[in-house]
Amino acid sequence: MTVTRVGLVMHGGRAQAGDAARIVRGWCAERGVHCADIDVWRDDTRHSAREEVAAAGNPDLIVTLGGDGTFLRGARLAAENDALVLGVDLGRVGFLTEVPAAAVCEALEAVQEDRITVESRMLLTLRASRRLQVPTGMEALLRYGRGPLLPPPRVRTDCAEGDDWGIALHVTALNDIVLEKLARDRQVSVGVYLAGRLLASYSADALLVATPTGSTAYSFAAGGPVVSPRAEALIFTPVAPHMAFNRSVVAAPDEPIALRVLDRSGPAAVSVDGQLRGVLDPGDWIGVYAAPRRLKAVRLGPMDFYGRLRERMNLTDAPAAVADGQAAPLWPVTSAPPADLAHLTLPPGPGDTPSAS
């Protein structure tokens, strides 16, 4: 593809990010490509994704310089603008970022020359019984991270609304949508519905709905399953539930998951990819489902998700297995697979080149 406008989202607390940003700006200047910093905390206020991408000139490529948290900020903007997102890895335990800082110029050249794989990632969105907002006076108490809160989500004007179906909100999540308790001494009580049917009522510290991409984030820390990012699923996981059934449930992509705050519960916070977006009172609900749009992530080649899982999670082998030495690939990659395996995803063989997907 031909890149004409680049948006930069960077981790301001890392010197490496500033160095990488100068390299990106220099690359853009040499090729006459418009480059704009997207400062999500300019003027000490947060802006909607639509305002941020408009201020940056509606970039067709967003480059994030940081770890997975920075990538999530960039993904929110890319989803709004249907842009590509390229993650430059300056973090420590990242699954989302793709390129080491030293290779950022080579990565930009690969994008410009269309020598990339475009990986389509599932996103979540939601409907709610009412507009989400943070009550006056509660923002300072609930402020997440170092900067101010995002503005309340806008109502989607392209979707029908009604008393039964609630209102559709301009929200996209690459990792997860979480409903969590506000009071330290009181769990949140929530009825959980899958595909419109009550699964169970929970008292828990939090309840979350994750994408396969988000299965290695908060959901993983809460005991949820690791799911291939190429899969299509919604993953429901309770966090510290006060009940015997504490398992995750993996739903099909067309099965929405609704969370209703019960009358005996206190208020509950709604966070989207770690960003506080509103507070629900007893009787309120949110319905989480697969978003119609997808994230378009730049990959320079096939992603070795399971190799990265082993590396980033520091997975170790059982003592009995260590004696066998370093594990080799199950199947050789020196020749083409036989016909009965040709439809499977296997390690790349000789001469394989990335293609858009």
Swiss-Prot record:
GO terms for cellular component: cytoplasm. Keywords: ATP-binding, Cytoplasm, Kinase, NAD, NADP, Nucleotide-binding, Transferase. It is found in: Cytoplasm. Pfam families: NAD_kinase, NAD_kinase_C. Its cofactor is a divalent metal cation. The active site is at D68 (proton acceptor). It is an enzyme of class 2 (transferase). Its EC number is 2.7.1.23. NAD(+) binds at D68, G69, R73, N175, D176, R186, D205, A240, Q275. Gene3D superfamilies: Probable inorganic polyphosphate/atp-NAD kinase, domain 1 (3.40.50.10330), Probable inorganic polyphosphate/atp-NAD kinase, domain 2 (2.60.200.30). It catalyses: NAD(+) + ATP = ADP + NADP(+) + H(+). Involved in the regulation of the intracellular balance of NAD and NADP, and is a key enzyme in the biosynthesis of NADP. Catalyzes specifically the phosphorylation on 2'-hydroxyl of the adenosine moiety of NAD to yield NADP. This is NAD kinase 1. It comes from Streptomyces avermitilis (strain ATCC 31267 / DSM 46492 / JCM 5070 / NBRC 14893 / NCIMB 12804 / NRRL 8165 / MA-4680).
